[in-house]
Design a protein with these regions (language model features):
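Cytoplasmic-entry segments and transmembrane alpha-helices of multi-pass inner-membrane transporters
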Residues: 1-20, 62-63
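Transmembrane alpha-helices
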Residues: 15, 39, 46-59, 72-101
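Residue-level signature of the transmembrane alpha-helical core
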Residues: 1, 5-8, 35-39, 80, ...
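Hydrophobic/aromatic residues in alpha-helical transmembrane segments
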Residues: 1, 14-18, 32, 46, ...
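Interhelical loop and adjacent transmembrane-helix boundary motif
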Residues: 100-150
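C-terminal transmembrane helix and the adjacent membrane-cytosol boundary/short C-terminal tail
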Residues: 51-66, 70-81, 134-159
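A structural signal for multi-pass alpha-helical bundles of membrane permease subunits
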Residues: 15-25, 93-98, 126, 151-152
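Membrane-interfacial helix termini and adjacent extracytoplasmic/periplasmic loops
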Residues: 12-41, 73, 110-112
């Protein structure tokens, strides 16, 4: 339950508490701090999807592979990974979307030298009206729509 806390706790609470903690250990205004907080916010999504995929995983496949002479590394790459890949990919996509959406945490943790695309868009919307922001937003919508259509197409091919 501790691992899914970032999903449940309001983002402002996470941002302020992370800011206070990182200020004490010197990670504010650093790329390392920014990466750590975004990893912590994305980890619950990866964990829940991968664990859900692993619950339906049949351990007999690994035993059969090992009994037929495959080494553990080959078993992982040829048996386990292809089966859990959809869970890993969906978790990674959720983590990316969450990280991309977290402007609040970035505003608290990042210094003036750490500029992310969401932060730049937020600043652009607030401070100056610029058609670049509309163009980037349009590209993001096209990217998301294309990604969703590709996933649906791949799902249809598996059936």
């Amino acid at each position: 339950s501790l691992l899914i806390a970032p999903m449940v706790v309001p983002i402002v609470v996470v941002a302020v508490s992370t800011y206070i903690f990182f200020a004490r250990i010197g990670l504010n205004d650093t790329y390392l701090g920014l990466v750590l907080v975004h990893a912590a916010l994305g980890a619950p999504f990866v964990l829940t999807t991968v664990l859900a995929t692993l619950q339906s995983f049949n351990d007999n496949l690994v035993r059969a592979s090992l009994s037929l002479g495959a080494n553990p590394l080959m078993t992982f790459f040829r048996i386990t990974l292809p089966i859990i890949a959809p869970g890993v990919i969906s978790g990674a996509l959720f983590a990316f979307a969450t990280s991309f959406d977290e402007v609040v945490v970035t505003l608290f943790i990042a210094g003036p030298t750490q500029v992310t695309l969401p932060r730049q868009m937020f600043t652009g919307i607030r401070e100056n009206i610029n058609p670049t922001i509309a163009a980037v937003a349009t590209l993001l919508i096209i990217f998301t729509t294309t990604l969703m259509l590709a996933l649906e197409w791949l799902r249809g091919r598996r059936r």
